[in-house]
Amino acid sequence: MEALVYTFLLISTLGIIFFAIFFREPPKVPTKGGK
């Protein structure tokens, strides 16, 4: 059970950091949406 909790927390932390960097610095990839 503890392994599941630790894994979930680890993935959640990595996900939050990833999205924080992603939204702070938009990828320089041409998108059809524009903006």
From Swiss-Prot:
Keyword Ion transport: yes or no? Answer: no
| Record's keyword terms, sorted | Chloroplast, Membrane, Photosynthesis, Photosystem II, Plastid, Thylakoid, Transmembrane, Transmembrane helix
GO cellular component assignments? chloroplast thylakoid membrane; photosystem II reaction center
Q: Which GO terms describe its biological process?
A: photosynthesis
Where's it found, cell-wise? Plastid, Chloroplast thylakoid membrane
- Taxonomically, which superkingdom? Eukaryota
Show the Pfam families listed in the entry.
PsbT
Any transmembrane segments, and where? 3-23
Q: How does it sit in the membrane?
A: Single-pass membrane protein
Is Transmembrane helix found in the keyword set?
A: yes
> Which HAMAP family does the annotation name?
PSII_PsbT
For this chain, the family text in UniProt reads: Belongs to the PsbT family.
| Subunit structure and binding partners | PSII is composed of 1 copy each of membrane proteins PsbA, PsbB, PsbC, PsbD, PsbE, PsbF, PsbH, PsbI, PsbJ, PsbK, PsbL, PsbM, PsbT, PsbY, PsbZ, Psb30/Ycf12, at least 3 peripheral proteins of the oxygen-evolving complex and a large number of cofactors. It forms dimeric complexes.
Per the entry, what this protein does is:
Found at the monomer-monomer interface of the photosystem II (PS II) dimer, plays a role in assembly and dimerization of PSII. PSII is a light-driven water plastoquinone oxidoreductase, using light energy to abstract electrons from H(2)O, generating a proton gradient subsequently used for ATP formation.
Protein name in the entry = Photosystem II reaction center protein T
What's the source species for this entry? Welwitschia mirabilis (Tree tumbo)
High-level lineage: Eukaryota, Viridiplantae, Streptophyta, Embryophyta, Tracheophyta
